[in-house]
Amino acid sequence: MSLNIKSQRTVALVRELAARTGTNQTAAVEDAVARRLSELDREDRARAEARRAAAEQTLRDLDKLLSDDDKRLIRRHEVDLYDDSGLPR
């Protein structure tokens, strides 16, 4: 498989990276792409963790707003929503 890079700037960057790391251009591109993908994976995990933490905080905030009677009513109605296996009816 081949890759045709038409950007002179990109070619120059790849050559510089290869020279500075002591590798060939293919290895330099492979390493750079692998590092960027790894960085994106870390960012995705961080965003997912932030969303999860925000959702948990929202649930904690909601829990503080509900009275004990409200919570009992919710639990009573949950029984109607799920069967004995915990699956939705």
UniProtKB/Swiss-Prot annotation:
Gene (UniProt): vapB42
Q: What does this protein do?
A: Possibly the antitoxin component of a type II toxin-antitoxin (TA) system. Its cognate toxin is VapC42 (Potential).
Recorded hits in InterPro entries, A to Z, give:
VapB-like
Keywords from UniProt, A to Z, are: Toxin-antitoxin system
Source organism's superkingdom?
Answer: Bacteria
* UniProt-recorded name of the protein: Putative antitoxin VapB42
